[in-house]
Regions:
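Structural motif
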Residues: 1-3, 20, 64
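Short histidine-centered beta-strand/loop micro-motifs
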Residues: 11-17, 58-59
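Short, conserved beta-strand element in jelly-roll/cupin
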Residues: 5-7, 17-32
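Short acidic-glycine-tyrosine-enriched beta hairpin
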Residues: 36-51
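Conserved beta-strand segments that form the floor/walls of ligand-binding pockets within enzyme
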Residues: 5, 33, 48, 68-69
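A short glycine-rich, His/Asp/Glu-containing loop-to-beta-strand
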Residues: 1-14, 71
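Ligand-binding loop in jelly-roll beta-barrel domains
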Residues: 51-75
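Short strand-coil-strand connectors
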Residues: 33-37, 60
């Protein structure tokens, strides 16, 4: 578990992870790109990203606060 903080316009430098991941958006806006598709990000939204899948947040106009959890079948 952790907290991702991105300032307005800050680049998200994530690389694919070896575990599944769940994101919970605490506050902010922008988009989450998973593979080649963009999903709108806003407060209280949840997202699932499977392991080894490219993804990153972008185009946030406010500070973005996201709680994340790693896991999988063996967790």
């Amino acid at each position: 578990m952790g907290l991702l903080l991105l300032q307005s316009g800050e680049k998200d430098t994530q690389i694919p992870h070896t575990s599944d991941e769940i994101y919970y958006v605490i506050s902010g806006d922008g988009f989450l790109r998973i593979k080649n598709k963009d999903y709108p990000v806003s407060q209280d939204k949840l997202f699932f990203v499977a392991k080894d899948v490219e993804h990153h947040f972008h185009s946030n106009t406010k500070e973005l606060k996201v709680l994340y959890f790693f896991g999988g079948p063996d967790s």
